[in-house]
């Protein structure tokens, strides 16, 4: 058996276009000048003239990013009342960084196997979302595995059913499975309850929703919008450099496909977010090139990207780690520099998110002094990171947010998904609960009794 590919096998060698230095890059960053890829590499590495991270230089980068954050968005730290309703773990793409998926064949009726995963019907999704909305939640995020029975809608299912080689388009009929996930439009429509904001259908899912057809991404996202989709999460980006994708997700949507899908979503009037998943086989040059592609995309979509979310790779339980392709994830220094350089480089995206799911509360708060200004959401369920070995739970109450944000002297602010609606929260005026949703009245989302089992997990 051949040994697994490692970072050392990557042939990528970035050659700077101009003479660069850390000091030049930092001077440009402090002045608010637009940074180049070469500048970003200098800042991410704290200088290509040194080995490892220079702690003094790192602090100067973080300080510059924190000043930029204050200039752009002030002292507010935002968060949203949201639910994660991931529909299915069934998938057969085989991304090496993922432990969310379960092999799709284990969900089939005739295998005699008991799957460790789950699939929800549209009616189950509606019930889950309706309950969350009644508690004050006003955003539902849904990112799922690429279930072979998924089709965009009824017309798409007819096309897939008639395909001469269904295996070639990764399709099996719903009857082959214990549970039918319905279609993508069924699920979106089911989750569109009582005015809740539906944030779903990544470019990868849109790619799956057009397989076997000549439909454009505009066709796909137009139908999803009609079904109730409001905004598109920019996950599945990972690193937008093909040689990295060839290692970590060779069966996944390409860089160009991801960018095309995101532009299409914006073209039909859907809002966007964007991400980077770093800390595996890529290097700082790959990260910098990714940032450049996101910045260029934001220009093409006329500012439709509301936030950028750096996602630190959680390595435990993933094939990359178990096959010795990587020995761990990003260091704390790398995490802080990723947030900071994202703030300094992405001069056309106002909001940078700190993910407590990835970093934990203490380090997540530190990121709010490294350039980040958003602190995610309540997240009633977070299966993806938890299944990969994440250690930081899956729920934060508004009271948690008020305590955490106030502890660093910043202003806690409830926001809508698109950041257009905001409510400053007075730390001296409890109880703390959402008020921006269709059924929000300030009541905490979970009672103390309901929350107790989560604290015991």
Identify the meaning behind each predicted range:
Residues 71-77, 136-138, 192-198, 228-231, ...:
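Short, well-ordered coil/turn segments that N-cap beta-strands
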Residues 60-110, 117-144, 232:
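N-terminal pre-triad scaffold of radical SAM enzymes
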Residues 82-83, 101-123, 205-216, 247-252, ...:
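Active-site mouth loops of central-metabolism enzymes
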Residues 140, 145-150, 198-211, 240-242, ...:
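Conserved strand-turn element in the central/C-terminal portion of the radical SAM core barrel
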Residues 1-52, 56, 63, 133, ...:
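Auxiliary Fe-S-binding modules of radical SAM enzymes
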Residues 140, 166, 170-174, 178-274:
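Radical SAM/AdoMet-radical enzyme domain recognition
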Residues 41-44, 81-83, 113, 142-179, ...:
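Glycine-rich, proline-tolerant flexible connector loops at the mouths of alpha/beta enzymes
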Residues 125, 129, 184-189, 218-221, ...:
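Generic structural signal for well-ordered alpha-helices
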